[in-house]
Amino acid sequence: MRQYNVTGMSCAACSARVEKAVGKVPGVTSCSVSLLTNSMGVEGDVPPEQIIAAVEQAGYGASEKGAGEKKPSGADATALEDKETPVLKRRLIASVGFLLVLMYFSMGHMMWGWPLPAWFEDNHIAMGLVQLLLAGIVMVINQKFFISGFKSLWHRSPNMDTLVAMGSMASFLWSVYVLFAMTRAQVDGNMEAVMDYMMDFYFESAAMILTLITVGKMLEARSKGKTTDALKGLMNMAPKTAVLVKGEKEVTVPIEQVEKGDIFVVRPGESIPVDGKILEGHSAVNEAALTGESIPVDKEEGDLVSAATINQSGFIRCEATRVGEDTTLSQIIRMVSDAAATKAPIAKIADKVSGVFVPVVILIAVVTTIVWLLAGQNVGYALARGISVLVISCPCALGLATPVAIMVGNGMGAKNGILFKTAVSLEEAGRVQIVALDKTGTITSGEPRVTDLVCEPGYDEKTLLELAGALEKKSEHPLAKAVLLEIAQRKIATKEVEDFQALAGNGLTGILEGHRLLGGSMKYISGQVTVGKQVKNQAQILAKQGKTPLLFAKDDVLIGMIAVADVIKEDSPKAVQELQNMGIRVVMLTGDNEQTAKAIGAQAGVDQVIAGVLPDGKEAVIRKLKEYGKVAMVGDGINDAPALTRADIGIAIGAGADVAIDAADVVLMKSRLSDVPAAVRLSRATLRNIHENLFWAFFYNIIGIPLAAGVWIPIFGWTLNPMFGALAMSLSSFCVVSNALRLNLFKVKDSHRDHKIKNEVTLPQWEASKGEKNMTKTMTIKGMMCGHCEARVKKTLEELEHVSEAQVSHEKGTAVVCMETEVADEVLKKAVEDQGYQVENIQ
């Protein structure tokens, strides 16, 4: 999508006109115009020159945003600066100054008996001329209304400025006519007519309309400026300089000059300038700027750091990995600003109304004037009713109702580490009825941890870990990392084993100080040493809880068992409970067997567990779930991308794969499941705010226009002076924007006001097919020449833990592996390659 800056827009009718004009350009597939940010997003294979020409032909200005330019993360902050308010403030001060003098002459003497210079006594012509001059000056000060309004009218796309310009100009021209008529009457000596004409002056209305609308515009501009505070805050976080290492020297350079691969240093208290990898040193880094999490994260050599985060302690030397618009901060800024440039589906209602609103209002004003003339009223009275209709009508309130709430909602999300990529995702997240959670990395941490230690008599936990660690230290198995992490946390020293062997599909063996050590699965160890019934029962209990028991022996005698599992995150049960309290059904998807899956599901408290789902089968499950309601998919892996795309709302955990993040509609920077209900909560609050804004905008116009037209005069005697109509118009947009700003006070983590949705869904019990109960992987193997090779590979694979069957063909060079639960590709590959064959691919 190409982004453009658009100038000259003043209300929703303007944005609708630009959108319509660009949408007609051949090759444009979609166009979205944001009145709030004066920007436009265009999709389609069309040269920028054609787009700009279409906008200019519609009576506005456009320029392409600098795509692909190398610039710092905060370079666009100036584009969001409130340049409108200072200009409007100067116009308002000047307008009020002349308006007060005008009001003194037009109403002060007549209504309150305020003194006038002697030469004005009974000099009605002079009074009229002074009012004409003062009103003219106010009109010149506010000439932008007339230039924009009549220019839009000329291009057959009238806007709010057209209504204001027509109302003010009509008042002024009528008053000029009355002044000439009064002059004629005074020449004729008809003083009674002169006094009547004095009452028909509307010079003060012409000036007052412009001044009051300027008041409203200034308040609106100031409030609109506040809606982008979150985005401007993100942009201003970007450091302006970096300290690069050039040979033996340290050189401070502008951030724009930092290249990928440069070496930079960061001292305590300084901001990290670009994304990088720590080469030397360690520190605690405050990542609140990106994640909203105030607790510093410990970083050491090899860890990644992000731009705009704060180095709180320690000197670090880093290599730049992402610079300019590729940094994490820049991507966040781009997501938030792109979301503001898109339109929510609910905005289409206001857009359709705004597109025809101004022409209809002009027609109503003309009809109102004619009807009152036909009813026998004089021209001045009828004109006042028509002018009131023009100046009270406000398309701006309609046009701003949705985008201001979307902008504030997006800003609140960004502050809390929740990034909505589009306005559609912000709106739709609150309507979700089913949330499907990937198990690994979403509900669980994604990294195995030691959960249980069971020691045989004569051995304690420390000794068990010392002996187990000696073996696992040389193993490449994923579960070995969990054991070594536990040893590191307990600060237990381990010794080196000799004659170490990793027996593929079986276990580990080695010699430590003359003693033979064994380690591995129940299947392997029970074939080597005697395993008591009590230990076997304990192993079964642990397996039912979703844990993997690892047994260890010394000199053919069992010494203990270590249970390892991918433990659930601390906040997962609470997050699931909060979603359920909102009336949302929570489903867990996993490739594990049913027993393991149900154990994890019970700990998390999900409504339903769907086990044995292949990586490429998640998309099919989401498609099936969508038959029952609106579905959100939460995942973090590459194999989650199809499911994230298929779901109504795809939510990616921020620590996951880039592919998953690209496929998602919402990105959770903190990688915490509790941010899923927070995202739903924020979406609902934003949607509620939009409904309030739209109600006010429609209600205001439905009540205001009939009142201005004089519909209630025959019944209640209610009438509306054009000046009060202008005041009402100026405040309407301000009220809408102010209401949207209330979202800044919303607490996304507060679950006390959560309520269930009206249309809760009921899910049937999921029956996994035979194909879903057993995971399969297809291995492409090079080097198998005969049936003996087949048998060898088949035996090796079937001896692996959780492998139920292996179908091997030396003709095809493949092995189809059926598993009770997922076995890591590395384990399968190592088992086969240890037998002398080459694994080319695993799918």
Predicted regions located by residue number:
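Flexible metal-binding regulatory segments at protein termini and peripheral loops
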Residues: 1-126, 224, 249-252, 334-342, ...
